[in-house]
Design a protein with these regions (language model features):
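Divalent-metal (often Zn2+) His-rich catalytic cores of metallo-beta-lactamase-fold enzymes
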Residues: 163, 188, 194, 204, ...
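Active-site neighborhood of phospho(di)ester-bond hydrolases with catalytic His/Asp-centered motifs
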Residues: 38-40, 62-74, 95-97, 196-198, ...
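Active-site metal-binding motif and surrounding structural segment of the metallo-beta-lactamase
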Residues: 8, 33-34, 44-94, 158
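Conserved beta-strand hairpin/beta-sheet module of binuclear metal-dependent hydrolase folds
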Residues: 5-60, 185-199
């Protein structure tokens, strides 16, 4: 039930998130002249629909930058929808963690067929959509099916903290390789004060060994990144992520990050 609400949600001033169109969330950050899109979902169609929804409510603006937070397909596979958007800027910047392209292609191309078959069982894809069949995946309703695409980053995040400005918006990035994904980042917006936890934080105990065959996660290292984010982004007033819903309030954010850190220790 908690994953069921879908639509466009305001997370912080100038920061909106579309939930319920894919297993992951698509985030739109308002820049000086356009949008920064974070994690353009898993397929072209599931990314195009949230972008259209955002335009209906937030107005038309060119996409100036895209951030791939990590190397799992549900966070980059819909990039073609951004390229196909008539409002996209010609000099689009694509930010990703160092090692993103290698990790994404090795997992989704070289091992893609085997992982795809296992994912059918892991996510219960053939089950009927009812109370006795497919209900939820925990992280979201269900993985998308459709055309998957990828793009080469123009800017790499390779250290912590790494400051960057995208269309007038100040970002502080955390480089978190070998956490929930082989290549991953999180970030903080020091002006609006939201912290984006990518997928190193969630509303469930995330799997350390995925049945579909993704690389095994180092729980202690992962926990260390969450603790680093808790200290680095201590002024955060909101924490939100690639899946599920935000936590509001500075004290609640600190408590949530501490609980997530301890979960993986």
């Amino acid at each position: 039930k908690l994953n069921a609400p879908h639509g466009l949600f305001e997370v912080a001033p100038g920061v909106h998130q579309v939930r319920g169109y894919d297993i992951a969330n698509l985030t739109v950050i308002q820049g000086r002249t356009g949008w920064i899109v974070v994690d353009p979902l898993g397929t072209r169609d599931t990314a195009a629909a949230p972008l259209a929804l955002a335009r209906r409510h937030l107005g038309d603006a060119p996409v100036r930058a895209v951030i791939f937070t990590h190397s799992h397909v549900d966070h980059f596979g819909g990039i073609d929808a951004v390229f196909a958007d008539p409002h996209v800027a010609g000099d689009l910047r694509i930010v990703a963690p160092r090692g993103f392209l290698e990790a994404a292609t090795s997992e989704n191309v070289m091992a893609g067929l085997a992982m795809g078959r296992r994912a059918v069982f892991m996510y219960g894809m053939p089950l009927p959509r009812d109370a006795r069949g497919h209900v939820d995946t925990g992280l979201g309703k269900e993985p998308a099916r459709g055309t998957v695409s990828i793009a080469e980053p123009t800017d790499l995040v390779d250290h912590t903290p790494q400051a960057m400005e995208l269309d007038g918006v100040r970002f502080v990035f955390q480089y978190a390789p070998g956490s929930e994904a082989p290549a991953e980042l999180t970030f903080y917006l020091p002006d609006a004060k939201p912290c984006y936890g990518a997928e190193i934080v969630s509303r469930n105990l995330h799997n350390l060994y995925t049945l579909r065959g993704a690389k095994v996660r180092d729980a202690l290292r992962w926990s260390g990144y969450i603790d680093e984010a808790r200290r680095l982004f201590a002024d955060a007033e909101v924490v939100f992520a690639s899946h599920q819903w935000p936590t509001f309030g500075k004290q609640r954010v600190a408590a949530y990050l501490a609980q997530q850190r301890d979960t993986y220790r």
